[in-house]
Amino acid sequence: MKAILVAGGHGSRMLPFTRYTHKTLLPLYNRPVIDYALATIRRSGISDITIIGNQFIGQIAQHVGTGLPGETIHYVIEEEPLGVHHALNLARPHVEGSRILLYFSDNITTIELTDTVQKFINSKKAPGCALIGRIVEDPERFGIAVFDNNQKLIDIIEKPKNPPSSFAIGGIYIYDESFWNRLDSVVAEKGAKMSISDINRTYVTEGSASIVQSEDSLWIDCGTPDALLEASHLAEQGKLSAKPCNIRKGDEPF
């Protein structure tokens, strides 16, 4: 099992700070944002991680380095944002043939993925996909789940104007090996305008998508200054953790 941490894009919601560094290197209380995202991946048991970044990938590599003992860290540069399919294909050589955890770096959460990851690792047959979701107050910003009367997932609508529910699926996903063929098919049909929801929908249609709900977990999209400030307050209160992470000589007590 391998992970892709997507940390590309311009970080336009974080200007002017992102003119000089990557948004994931901005401070979230006493650690950079990326440490919290990596911690969620690491706690799941995955030790092979590919990080996709923009022109500041060198700064990310300087901070993350070779990772923790026993880890394999790959770095991929997205020189210009050409869509999610382009970014993922840059990481493809490092992960194709493996089941993957796909993690978009703005998502800071206390959800623990260990059990779900282990189920995917241990499954002898293709396990489909696991969609990590939660109830949100602004469903227009997310891929939103559509349920039938029996609460069975039947569709996903990307950023709907009239949301059919408040259950958002976005930012963290777990996929079997068929992900890349599905990506190719969706790109062939929809081109650069495709979204992750389009890929997820292929799993939903065939009944191989499951939902993991973060009912009692914190989950913050740290892509805006206000959200980053909120997350910093939560981390200060001990409600968000960046452990395990690299602690170097000279770092603040942690």
Which ranges hold each PLM region?
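Catalytic-core segments of class I nucleotidyltransferases/pyrophosphorylases
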Residues: L101, Q118-I121, K152-G250
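Conserved beta-strand termini and adjacent loop/short-helix elements that scaffold enzyme active sites
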Residues: N54, V76-E78, I132, V212-E215
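Conserved donor-nucleotide/metal-binding helix-loop-beta segment in metal-dependent transferases, i.e.
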Residues: I111-E140
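Active-site glycine-centered loops adjacent to acidic/histidine catalytic or metal-binding residues
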Residues: G9, D106, I135
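Ligand/cofactor pocket segment of small-molecule handling proteins
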Residues: E137, N150-K152
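Conserved N-terminal catalytic core of the sugar/cofactor nucleotidyltransferase
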Residues: M1-L5, R13-P16, L26-P27, R31-D115, ...
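A structural signal for short hydrophobic beta-strand segments in well-ordered beta-sheet cores
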Residues: L25, A145-F147, I211
